[in-house]
């Protein structure tokens, strides 16, 4: 694959803009010319850039993070919950057939769980976001994908239970699923050791 095809596939000018705004453009270019352009090299480049961004954010917000850690007091009593959270902002009636089938598979198999579908219409019944967050979402600065990242954290913090992405198909009955999926204090999939293709995933949030 040529440089032009790789550039276009990885996001083109939008990727360059994103890396520039994140302050990691030099790192990305250096890694690209150092590692090469095969699949494994590009995956390692992505991980390297992610780590660099994380370092920059930790440095930038070090004082705020330290203040939060020292002053935050969780007064909420956390109890075991049987809630399963799913989100499709447009409502199930407007969802693709894939999402409808996945949602029905949860209802059919997780029969002892309270499955709750979050939409743009009922979201404020469960969580309250600051006005500036909602305004950025309405204007498109925060995408639906990024909004669900905020939403899943708020729901799990305040209500507990499990978050499942709307495109996850459940193929086993609740009795066949290991209890630690539901009963752990915190559960998510991760891949810590890079595989042969260089892929690693610290946190995969499609099921939490």
Predicted segments, located by residue:
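Short catalytic/ligand-binding loop motif for oxyanion handling, primarily in non-cytosolic enzymes
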Residues: 93-95, 124-127, 171-174, 178, ...
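Intrinsically disordered, low-structural-confidence terminal and linker regions
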Residues: 1-22
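N-terminal anchoring/stem segment of glycosyltransferases
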Residues: 17-129
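Short, glycine/charged-enriched secondary-structure capping and boundary segments
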Residues: 99-100, 131-132, 177-179
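A general structural signal for short secondary-structure junctions and capping/turn motifs
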Residues: 75-77, 107, 179, 197-200
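Conserved hydrophobic/aromatic beta-strand scaffold that supports enzyme active sites
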Residues: 205-207
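Active-site-proximal specificity loops/subdomain of glycosyltransferases
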Residues: 114-150, 154
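GT-A fold catalytic core of metal-dependent nucleotide-sugar glycosyltransferases
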Residues: 145-192, 199, 203
